[in-house]
Amino acid sequence: MNIKRPFILISNDDGYHANGIKTLVSFLKDHADVLVCAPEAARSGFSCAFSAATPLRLKRRHNMGDVEVWSCNGTPVDCVKLALSELCGHRKPDLVLGGINHGDNSTVNNHYSGTMGVAREGCMKYIPSVAFSTCNYDDEADLSYLRDDVCRIVERVLADGLPKGVCLNVNFPAQPPFMGVKVCRMTFGSWINEVVKARHPHGYDYYWMAGECRNDEPDAEDTDQWALNHGYIAITPTRIDITDYAFIDTIKSWSL
């Protein structure tokens, strides 16, 4: 590795083989020392889960050009933990990136997302961290049109850093041209019609998690979902500390 170049750790929740992570590596490999450690298979929806009772394995995969690639049988967070402990050596990454995720992580999906789990884990290790996602759900889509925007965000975070305990959730509309960038808050919403019930031929019920994410404030123009719906790149600063400070005094008044 060239210590004069930034060192970037990349993971995701779609798996080391996914088009999105390969695209992200291709954007950055000529400008930084990049290391990939990602799940061996898709781990969408794993958020910040880690493996407390399952032994983990690291497996070396084929390089992406000159970029070293490892997979792990665990979660996205497991990948970050193992990479920092076992693969990075004595060099701490300058940046942790998650993505590029096939599917947006706006609104409450922020909480479920394994891609955001990558960024949160990096953030909790005091490393500037960013999660990238696109509303384009096509696993084989050509995402090269994201290059300039991704690189500009990465360069700015490398130059200026991020506040302690803050990571970025970046979501792109499905297709260009983009209207610009909106720095915005997370949309409040909820998943509805989530459970699909079916009957197995062997005589028992089984269930699929499905449904749709409902936007509960569709007219609020300061939200990530509004930005995406109107063609803007949505950047949401996300805090690790989820304390509701405004409500602390109210709870104290309960005399519990």
What is each of the regions a protein language model found here?
Residues 104-113:
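Glycine/threonine-rich flexible loop motifs
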Residues 10-17, 109-110:
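Short, glycine-rich nucleotide/cofactor-binding loops
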Residues 2-8, 19-86, 90-91:
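A cross-family phosphate/adenosyl-ligand binding-site feature
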Residues 118-122:
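Hydrophobic/aromatic ligand-binding patch that stacks against planar heteroaromatic rings
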Residues 94-95:
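Conserved acidic residues
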Residues 144-256:
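Electrostatically charged, flexible surface regions
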Residues 123-145:
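Glycine-rich phosphate/pyrophosphate-binding loops
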Residues 14-23, 201:
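Short acidic, Gly/Ser-rich segments with clustered Asp/Glu that frequently serve as metal-coordination loops
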